[in-house]
Amino acid sequence: MLVIASVVLAMILWGITFVVFKYANLSFDPIAIVFIRLFISVPFLFGFALISGRMMKIRKGDFKYFFIMAFFEPFIYFLGEAFGLSMVSSTMGAVIIAIIPLLVPVAAYFLIKERLSVMNIIGLIISFGGVLMVIMASEGQFSGNAKGILLMFIAVLAAVGYTIMAKKLVHTYNGIIITAWQSTLGALLFLPLFMIFEFREVLHLTVQPESWYAVLYLGIFGSGVCFILFTAGIRELGASKANVYANLVPVVTAIVSYFMLDEA
């Protein structure tokens, strides 16, 4: 029961991140948002691991798995999500992201030979239909934000890759260490992009207070607490079952965005 509560809390906090991103985007561009949130999350995560006595040494042979996982998420995932959310509404972004739990069993079937049920296939078809309805209803026509929608789907595929790769590590390492190294490697991957494209601009920015609060939330909760809770869920429930709760994300986002962003 505690594990389920942890996963549900992770999804609630994640749902809020789609709205909070919009406040961060008032001052920062997408790459800066992602790099700064990861930069904040790394000391938070390693500090928490040290204080809680959960610090673990990574075996040399496992670094390649950590790197591949970090390449999928946060690197590719956040590139897709951050730029995608700058082009589509918070609610639409969350609805697209919500198809992740339905794609994970399909990917697991082909990549790690997990059983795929008929219900998984039916759910995937229904989910894609629902996403299409939201896109048409929100934008008037599919092509209205085609680039943003495509970027969100790239984020979805990256999250699926991350979830499959995480299955290799969750039974060896605790969620805090996995998330800490994931954020560290992700920050290193984003560092060249940040230095080349946005470092000088950030130095001369007049940042609105709400943007700093938003980036702090994204770093501590979005890239820290959420991943710790979710990784624990994968460990106890399995990838497919843990991802089922992702259906809560668009619901939370829709409610919060209605009150905070006035999105219908």
Annotate each language-model stretch with its function.
Residues 45, 67, 116-138, 190, ...:
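Hydrophobic transmembrane alpha-helices of multi-pass small-molecule transport proteins
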